[in-house]
């Protein structure tokens, strides 16, 4: 006897999605365009997610600044090298932890590393501070809106991603 009730039956749509999601050992795929490298190591391909983690005060923000600076000039900054297609040059940077003052310092550090002037808005960098917005749902909605309403986005940085949820240990979030 089957213990499943009506809720166990997959809908035809789910069945179709499930089948399309399967990967076979004989499938052939090509490497997505490599857009970020550290020396010769690939750290970012177009369309994929990467995470930078480390202990507090471990210079994560500085490394992200160098990476963003490389993406901003589509070239090399320190050991980071970026090569984004022209149709994916916009960078969205969201900070959930720092004040506008400190966010501006981060932006200035990025521009300095990129060799760009500090008296003009950078063409491809959109920097947003979200600390003043308390609700994680609203922060996520703003990020989602920016991603879907900014043309040619190639890189999204979220500094403080844990602030996009109420409880980092919650299995439902």
Task: Locate the predicted segments by residue.
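The Walker A/P-loop phosphate-binding site
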Residues: 7-110, 117
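Conserved inter-motif catalytic segment of the P-loop NTP-binding fold
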Residues: 85-172
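Long, basic/Gly/Ser/Thr-rich N-terminal segments
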Residues: 1-5
């Amino acid at each position: 006897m089957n213990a499943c009730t009506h809720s166990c039956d997959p809908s035809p749509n789910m069945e179709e999605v499930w089948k399309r999601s399967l990967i076979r050992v004989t499938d052939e795929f090509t490497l997505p365009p490599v857009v970020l490298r550290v020396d010769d190591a690939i750290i970012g391909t177009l369309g994929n997610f990467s995470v930078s983690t480390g202990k507090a005060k471990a210079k994560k923000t500085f490394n992200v600044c160098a990476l963003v600076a490389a993406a901003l000039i589509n070239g090399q900054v320190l050991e980071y090298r970026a090569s984004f297609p022209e149709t994916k040059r916009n960078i969205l940077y969201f900070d959930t932890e720092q004040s506008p003052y400190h966010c501006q310092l981060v932006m200035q550090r990025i521009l300095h590393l990129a060799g760009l002037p500090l008296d003009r808005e950078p063409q491809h960098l959109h920097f947003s501070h979200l600390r003043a917005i308390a609700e994680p749902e609203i922060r996520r909605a703003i990020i989602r809106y920016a991603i879907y309403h900014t043309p040619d986005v190639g890189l999204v940085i979220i500094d403080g991603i844990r602030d996009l949820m109420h409880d980092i240990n919650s299995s439902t979030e």
